[in-house]
Amino acid sequence: MSRIGKQPVTVPSGVDVTIDGQNVSVKGPKGTLTLDVAEPIAVTRDDDGAIVVTRPNDERRNRSLHGLSRTLIANLVTGVTEGYTTKMEIFGVGYRVVAKGSNLEFALGYSHPVLITAPEGVTFAVETPTKFSISGIDKQKVGQIAANIRRLRKSDPYKGKGIRYEGEQIRRKVGKTGK
């Protein structure tokens, strides 16, 4: 039995969960999220109102999907109650970010500014010209946008210039030495 999959997902008050076959819909104070659970996995509610994820047998694929499905449902519940936020930093002379409506405009040393559009359900907040955050209820969307932005200018191992997650440590390299 999967250690993660066998744990029930507790549903806090103010959150409404609808299970329709393989479709799980979670509605909370921040919005609504839905998930299509993979075919052999069964999702039910127990007497306490918690969500229970079960698998029909111990095939390798079913074991893999068991813990994954439970975690994805738990992420839906957390998303509609608390939401997800990723904070990012920009390092480098002249590198900065500016909010343009619901979009972000980056100056990253290229010959042109880079514009990132916020997808539906994701918001950007610029604290300083070198610090910004990405917020939303869908963990996958927030993480994917953060990864896409980080990829615009990855941190350089020699000078440390670039975009990185807040608190991320970049492994620095020593440059060439002269004779």
From Swiss-Prot:
Disulfide bonds: none annotated. PROSITE patterns: RIBOSOMAL_L6_1. Keywords: Ribonucleoprotein, Ribosomal protein, RNA-binding, rRNA-binding. One of its GO terms (cellular component) is cytosolic large ribosomal subunit. One of its GO terms (biological process) is cytoplasmic translation. Gene3D superfamilies: Ribosomal protein L6, alpha-beta domain. GO terms for molecular function: rRNA binding; structural constituent of ribosome. Pfam families: Ribosomal_L6 (PF00347). The keyword Magnesium does not apply. NCBIfam families: L6_bact. Belongs to the universal ribosomal protein uL6 family. Part of the 50S ribosomal subunit. This protein binds to the 23S rRNA, and is important in its secondary structure. It is located near the subunit interface in the base of the L7/L12 stalk, and near the tRNA binding site of the peptidyltransferase center. This is Large ribosomal subunit protein uL6. It comes from Mycolicibacterium vanbaalenii (strain DSM 7251 / JCM 13017 / BCRC 16820 / KCTC 9966 / NRRL B-24157 / PYR-1).
